[in-house]
Amino acid sequence: MKETPCPNCGKPLTGDMVRSSNVPCQFRCGHCRERLYEYKVSAPIMLVSLAAIVLLIYLLMLLRNAAGSVLPAVQHVPMAVFALVCAYPVFIVSERMIAKYVIQNGNIIYRGKRKGS
């Protein structure tokens, strides 16, 4: 597996650093605490994520209707609860895959002054 060094301090970046951020294209180095930016893979990842969200909503509606014919009580469960229970494992797996992909294939830059300059 390819290790990507921090452009500021030179220490290796990890997927945990990307996952701890709210936005996958901006995160902090765990060693020097400087904000890093990633430009190469963020836009395609976000487009795929939006498409996956739309697909999941459609599939959840189909699943709820199919389960509603077998168990009528499912029709009275709010769609948000149904979506959280079904989509949370998918979210966790995709978050880890995105972090791994950003670390391996991303173009990570630092906009501030380099250490020692």
From Swiss-Prot:
Induction: Significantly induced under copper-limiting conditions. Its main location: membrane. One of its GO terms (cellular component) is plasma membrane. It is a multi-pass membrane protein. It is found in: Cell membrane. Disruption phenotype: Cells lacking this gene show no difference in growth under copper deprivation or copper excess conditions. The keyword Transmembrane applies. The keyword Ribonucleoprotein does not apply. It comes from the Bacteria. Disulfide bonds: none annotated. The chain crosses the membrane at residues 43-63, 73-93. Keywords: Cell membrane, Membrane, Transmembrane, Transmembrane helix. This is Uncharacterized protein YcnL. It comes from Bacillus subtilis (strain 168).
